[in-house]
């Protein structure tokens, strides 16, 4: 059974100033923080770097490599990881096998997007939901489940997943609804998920 931790961090609960940690996180995220003008976007990138340093000890460029589809991996450690962010939340998934995570603020149902991205069975499920609120929630849940699976495989919705025969049913998917968001984690085998909310009371 795979070992999996999913760490949640709220960007609005940072207990220190960004300048305290910019020199202690992966330069990739420090540079994105300084480049982004929108505060929410900048803080998301900063917290990504903080979580990598805090939970995996990753803060130097030479510690990370990239697959052919751009998915990052650790060069000198057995652990696999994946990051996602939306709104006030940043998520870090850590596992001893490949993992994909996705978090999304609940979004409006869009029929054309559903037809393009979801299976026929999923489209029928969406069409049968009567209330707009419930349909939006289901649409977002399905989106995060698919995104987690595709991120596990190192691609995304634009990565030719239909042509590659990706079948969501072959994966173990864990999903949680939380205050206007959906969070999903995908692995190849059934696993127990340890969900941790990072309190951000100390630096990296």
Regions found by a protein language model. Give the residues of each.
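Core catalytic alpha/beta fold that binds nucleotide/phospho-ligands
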Residues: 1-204
